């Protein structure tokens, strides 16, 4: 939310605030119990967790940390910010860090799947070294480091009776350009290009999957990626509008004014979409779990995560067995035949 409130203008304020509160309220009511269910199910019922399930767990935690702040934002929009500026900065800092984490986790899901299919031996090494835990530590540290600028720029503003924690104050146009460019490049452009490349390269492999159950985790992750794009593109389009307004401020002041008006009008919508991205993933998991038969003691989503982990575990044993056989083999023909078959098997097995 860059430098403006959700909505300005006396005639539109009431409608905008009501709309914002309704959207954010729905995000909280749907996303919070949904992500809690995901976290509880994985921690309680999935003992052997594949890389995919671990990434989903961290994604649910990041989304949950964002969503639990929504009641305070709703109250603030409806009335006024009641806490200090330090609390405002701290909350926005945590939200930004968790949103960076969500973006990076979704990106890693795609890269990990790409490596597992296209470079199976590298994937085997990844699993043996248990590098994912170290990568997750680096990911969270990077997310909190990249969010430091909001501590400097975020501030309280507005009339005394309606102070809001939705403003960024930049010391110069240069600072704004640098920070918005970094946010869009690191937080969206690079991750989204990575997602497109990974799934573009895997498209032909995914098309070979004949059994719906074996395609489940791939379709699930693809759905998460698509929703990620739909929810985040508008936010970064607003960043581009801000950059364009700065670039044209001197030569085309009228165009700059129109861009700023468009930015102000769209901020409510883009802000709501960002929070929707944190609440929609559990819905996707439940939709993917709908075909799993469940007993009285097991839920469909529990069966989904167990299925993903069990197929990954079974595949990992198969892969390591293949590596061992390949090292002991003395015929290049058999090696070639086996190497040709493995990527297809990898694609057909859910991570």
Language model: regions and residue ranges:
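Intrinsically disordered regulatory tails of 7TM GPCRs
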Residues: 1-8, 137, 159, 250-258, ...
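Extracellular N-terminal segment of 7TM GPCRs
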Residues: 1-33, 37, 171, 180, ...
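Loop architecture of class A 7-transmembrane GPCRs
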Residues: 2-11, 81-92, 96, 119, ...
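Extracellular TM2-ECL1-early TM3 structural module of rhodopsin-like
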Residues: 13-21, 25, 51-109, 116-126
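Hydrophobic alpha-helical transmembrane segments of polytopic
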Residues: 20-23, 27, 132-139, 224, ...
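Hydrophobic alpha-helical segments of membrane proteins
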Residues: 68, 145-152, 189-196, 225-244, ...
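Class A GPCR helix-loop hinge within the 7TM core
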Residues: 99-137, 202-203, 207, 286-293
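Intracellular effector-coupling site of seven-transmembrane GPCRs
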Residues: 135, 166-173, 183-188, 200-237, ...
């Amino acid at each position: 939310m860059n430098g403006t409130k959700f909505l300005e203008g006396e005639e539109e304020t009431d409608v905008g605030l009501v709309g914002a509160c309704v959207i954010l309220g729905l995000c909280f009511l749907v996303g919070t119990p949904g992500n809690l269910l995901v976290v509880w199910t994985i921690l309680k019922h999935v003992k052997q967790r594949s890389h995919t399930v671990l990434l989903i767990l961290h994604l649910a935690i990041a989304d949950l940390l964002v969503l639990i702040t929504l009641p305070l934002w709703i109250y603030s929009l409806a009335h006024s910010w009641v806490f200090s500026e330090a609390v405002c900065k701290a909350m926005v800092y945590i939200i930004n860090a968790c949103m960076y984490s969500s973006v990076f986790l979704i990106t890693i899901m795609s890269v990990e799947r790409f490596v597992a299919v296209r470079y199976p031996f590298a994937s085997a090494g990844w699993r043996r070294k248990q590098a994912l835990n170290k990568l997750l530590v680096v990911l969270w540290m990077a997310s909190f480091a990249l969010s430091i600028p909001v501590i400097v720029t975020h501030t309280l503003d507005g009339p005394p009776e309606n102070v809001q924690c939705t403003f960024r104050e930049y010391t110069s146009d240069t600072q704004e350009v640098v920070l918005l460019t970094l946010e869009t490049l690191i937080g969206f452009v690079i991750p989204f290009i990575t997602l497109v490349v990974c799934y573009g390269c895997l498209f032909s492999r995914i098309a070979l999957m004949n059994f719906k159950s074996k395609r489940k985790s791939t379709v699930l992750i693809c759905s998460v990626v698509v929703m990620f794009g739909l929810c985040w593109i508008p936010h970064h389009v607003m960043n581009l509008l801000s950059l364009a307004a700065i670039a044209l401020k001197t030569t085309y002041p009228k165009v700059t004014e129109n861009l700023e008006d468009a930015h102000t009008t769209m901020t409510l919508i883009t802000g709501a979409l960002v929070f929707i991205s944190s609440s929609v993933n559990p819905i996707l998991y439940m939709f993917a779990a709908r075909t799993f038969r469940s007993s009285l003691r097991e839920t469909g989503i529990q069966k989904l995560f167990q299925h993903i982990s069990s197929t990954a575990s079974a595949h990992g044993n198969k892969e390591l067995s293949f590596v061992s056989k390949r090292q002991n083999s003395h015929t290049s023909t058999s090696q070639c035949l086996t190497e040709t078959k493995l990527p297809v098997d990898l694609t057909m097995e859910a991570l």
